[in-house]
Amino acid sequence: MAYISGKTMLENAYKEGYGVGAFSAHNAETIQGILEAAEQMKSPIMIQVGQKVIQNVGLEPMKALIDIYMKDVTVPVAVHLDHCRDLGQAMKAIQLGFQSVMFDGSALSFEENAEKTKLVADAASHLGIGSEGEIGKIGGTEDDITVDEKDAQITSEEEALAFADRSRVDYLALSIGTAHGIYKQEPELAFDRIEEISKSLNKPLVMHGGSDVPDADVKKAIGLGIAKINVDTELRVAFTEGMKQCLQDNPNEYHLAHSLGAGKEAMIDKVKEKIRVFGSENKARTY
């Protein structure tokens, strides 16, 4: 299976009532882990490339690395640019062959957010690439941007509809009670708001801050219209704990292939766990 447009992938998930995991990659081992888990579970997935990784590795090198490991992959995969705040970077990702791009203008005024997001959505649409925008303020820390939880704002139905109409994005990220990073307390999701917006908008919705949200809450949100669930923190924790355990068991282990391999295996287990929760296992055959 070749790469597939994020738009096609999420519209299929939305129609069929399951969620697609958008898993953040950071290096070769995390790319391998995400793809191996998807293959084992026969699941469509998104690989996300975030801003911190772009700062450390570079946009083009990350896409090239993913391309290398995609050669023998048989499940549908979309590479997604996450939380882009620079129009030039978004256009570069489109040129590099990303299948999905997000412009995050949530820190801007409504008008500027909609205007800039539409520029990205229009460019992506011409090439059949999926586009994502964000309306509302999602709490927590994502790369170099922090939104205090007290400043987080639940997205209203009115602003979601107006933003979707103005920006023309294919799928929309909402502020629904989740947060980026590690939760200080269990999140309270605005299920009624998800349902209202989904019924009015009739297009895939996106959950950011999907790590550590209770499984039952995630499943309920998917049933109400969430089609893309972003997962990063839980994967990084699993990978790091896998490495730590390897080094604790073997204090004199200096072969990075061993410790990184242990991290990858732990991450594979976590990705497979999430795929089961999202309901995308064996959904690759529907493409």
Curated annotation (Swiss-Prot):
Q: For binding Zn(2+), which residues are annotated in this chain's numbering?
A: H83, H180, H208
Q: Which cofactors does it use?
A: Zn(2+)
Keywords assigned by UniProt, alphabetized: Carbohydrate metabolism, Lyase, Metal-binding, Zinc
Q: Does the keyword Lyase apply?
A: yes
Quote the cofactor binding remark. Answer: Binds 1 zinc ion per subunit.
One matching Pfam family is F_bP_aldolase
Record's Gene3D superfamilies? Answer: Aldolase class I
Q: Which reaction does it catalyse?
A: 6-deoxy-6-sulfo-D-fructose 1-phosphate = (2S)-3-sulfolactaldehyde + dihydroxyacetone phosphate
Q: Where is the active site?
A: D82
For dihydroxyacetone phosphate, which residues are the binding ones?
Answer: G181, G209, G210, S211, N230, V231, D232, T233
Q: CDD domains, alphabetically?
A: TBP_aldolase_IIB
Its Enzyme Commission number(s) read 4.1.2.57
Q: What does this protein do?
A: Part of the sulfo-EMP2 pathway, a D-sulfoquinovose degradation pathway that produces sulfolactate (SL). Cleaves 6-deoxy-6-sulfo-D-fructose 1-phosphate (SFP) to form dihydroxyacetone phosphate (DHAP) and 3-sulfolactaldehyde (SLA).
Q: Which family does it belong to?
A: Belongs to the class II fructose-bisphosphate aldolase family.
Q: What is this protein called?
A: Sulfofructosephosphate aldolase
Q: Which organism is it from?
A: Alkalicoccus urumqiensis
